[in-house]
């Protein structure tokens, strides 16, 4: 039972990324962070862990596994409590680095204390620690975030690590004096081809863990617990496929191909529903279960502390690099696509057959303050507010408008995430190609039934999602040229006539400024967009000396 405590503590340190990921959207809002900022919450931990694992091997050789393990788990516990109490992103990131230092020491020591390099109960517990973390991480993180807050994720880690800390302290008191210099043999020659493939595969799997959660919770405003259940498909599929036998190189190649196909399907999501992510996650999870065990411990030996440290460093370095590269890309894409969605949504409002006073009331609120934190959730709140007091045809028109605006925003979010999914799918495919360049069984892998089946499954799934994506394409809201004549809403009555006159005047001004009428209207109501308009078009849209003559056509 003492070993179980060590294994559970190691499992939490290994599962950190999958647990914490579900809290990132809440951190994004509460700490007023950016996408790059919340990516660092994972990135700092994985990067520091990757760097600290090899020095931790030296510490274990110098001072003994149990003392280093106790110190590591103790540091991890204290830092976890500090993370939960953090009131700024900067402090949280510092403590995440401290947490990773403790995690690195604890993991290297745990491998030796469990005797993870030899076949038997210790090895099974070491492997179970990884599986345990992968399996419970998403569900635990989502449940804690929804029931309490993101802080509960870190507070909950402390009591889970505590038994491992106590066991390590107990072993340290009884460990032989010469334990500090013992080592179960030297490391084997390092297989760099498999190592590079492992790093690329780990980077690709980041898309399924980090990006899917961000897409579901921040992009599509799905509750954390529902998102946790959705992404739990990945570990379930991984655990199921990890039991399949076969040559490790064949399993590794097959797994990489399945991950590439699954992540590729995520780039072709036809709708804003968590259900559309299930099949891609099943593919990626099955690939993960095939490839990771084959690469970790089989193609890349894991017989000593140094072997284990190298292997974990490679995995976490791949994750850290992926986060560092993908976060700025997704942030830039979100900003760009939300700006486009803001203009398209405003165009839809202006063209809707609603009274002009209602348009004036809702247009700035619907899209003026729309940002990348939770665009769909913000939009839905404003739509619900706009529906209040409407009845009859106006209520119906507002309902139709709401549906169209929802399609605009969710489509923009999918477009923002698409390039990152394409890139990470390519990483998994590259991992498979690198394995195929070897001289072992993988060199002739394409002729093997397992690899052929994986390749066909990936292609069929990607093709099916491609067809569904093409068929789901709806007519986009077009931003009209203000310099050309266009059909006006024409709702009738005096107010309708005044509305048409106002829109025509807005077109004249936008034409003179070289902008769209939607861009001009938003700039009139939103300070940030006003400054952006002035930078792009060289004129202050709120300056009456500029706006007045432009409206009159002078």
Q: Whereabouts are the PLM-identified features?
A:
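Transmembrane-helix exit segments and adjacent C-terminal regions of multi-pass membrane proteins
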Residues: 1, 361-453
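12-transmembrane solute porter fold
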Residues: 2-24, 32-36, 41-45, 50, ...
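Paired small-residue
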Residues: 79-82, 90-99, 275-283
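Cytoplasmic helix-loop-helix junction between adjacent transmembrane helices
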Residues: 97-130
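Helix-loop-helix hairpin linking two adjacent transmembrane segments in secondary transporters
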Residues: 129-168
């Amino acid at each position: 039972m003492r070993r179980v405590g060590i294994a559970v503590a190691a499992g939490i340190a290994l599962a950190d990324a999958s647990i914490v990921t579900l809290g990132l959207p809440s951190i994004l809002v509460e700490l007023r962070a950016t996408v790059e900022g919340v990516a660092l919450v994972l990135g700092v931990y994985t990067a520091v862990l990757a760097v600290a694992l090899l020095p931790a091997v030296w510490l274990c050789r110098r001072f003994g596994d149990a003392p280093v393990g106790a110190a590591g788990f103790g540091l991890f516990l204290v830092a976890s409590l500090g993370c939960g109490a953090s009131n700024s992103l900067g402090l949280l990131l510092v403590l995440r680095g401290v947490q990773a230092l403790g995690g690195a020491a604890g993991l290297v020591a745990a491998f030796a204390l469990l005797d993870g390099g030899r076949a038997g109960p210790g090895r099974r517990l070491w492997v179970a620690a990884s599986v345990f973390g992968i399996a419970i991480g998403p569900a635990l993180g989502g449940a804690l975030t929804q029931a309490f807050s993101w802080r509960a994720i870190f507070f909950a880690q402390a009591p889970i690590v505590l038994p491992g800390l106590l066991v390590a302290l107990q072993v340290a008191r009884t460990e032989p004096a010469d334990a500090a210099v013992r080592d179960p043999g030297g490391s084997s020659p390092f297989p760099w081809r498999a190592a590079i493939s492992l790093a690329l595969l780990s980077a690709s799997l980041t898309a399924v863990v980090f990006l899917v959660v961000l897409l579901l919770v921040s992009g599509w405003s799905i509750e954390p617990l529902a998102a946790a259940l959705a992404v739990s498909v990945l570990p379930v599929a991984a655990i199921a496929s990890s039991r399949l036998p076969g040559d490790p190189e064949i399993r590794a190649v097959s797994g990489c191909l399945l991950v590439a196909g699954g992540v590729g399907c995520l780039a072709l999501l036809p709708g804003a529903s968590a259900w559309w992510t299930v099949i891609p996650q099943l593919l990626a999870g099955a690939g993960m279960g095939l490839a990771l065990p084959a690469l970790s411990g089989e193609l890349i030996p894991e017989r000593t502390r140094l072997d284990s440290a190298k292997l974990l460093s490679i995995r976490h370095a791949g994750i850290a690099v992926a986060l560092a590269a993908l976060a700025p890309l997704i942030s830039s894409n979100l900003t760009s696509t939300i700006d486009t969605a803001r203009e398209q949504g405003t165009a839809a409002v202006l063209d809707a057959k609603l009274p002009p006073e209602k348009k004036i009331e809702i247009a700035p609120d619907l899209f003026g303050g729309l940002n990348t934190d939770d665009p769909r959730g913000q939009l839905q709140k404003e739509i619900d507010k706009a529906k209040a007091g409407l009845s009859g045809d106006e209520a119906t028109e507002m309902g139709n408008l709401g549906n169209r605006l929802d399609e605009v925003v969710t489509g923009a979010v999918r477009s923002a995430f698409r390039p990152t999914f394409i890139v990470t799918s390519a990483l998994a495919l590259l991992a498979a190609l690198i394995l195929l360049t070897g001289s072992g069984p993988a060199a002739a892998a394409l002729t093997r039934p397992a690899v052929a089946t994986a390749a066909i499954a990936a292609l069929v799934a990607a093709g099916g999602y491609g067809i569904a994506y093409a068929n789901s394409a709806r007519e986009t809201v077009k931003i009209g040229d203000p310099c050309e004549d266009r059909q006006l809403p024409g709702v009738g009555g005096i107010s309708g006539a005044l509305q048409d006159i106002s829109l025509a005047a807005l077109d004249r001004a936008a034409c003179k400024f070289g902008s769209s009428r939607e861009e001009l209207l938003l700039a009139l109501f939103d300070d940030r967009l006003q400054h952006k308009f002035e930078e792009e078009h060289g004129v202050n849209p709120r300056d009456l000396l500029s706006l007045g003559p432009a409206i009159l056509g002078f």
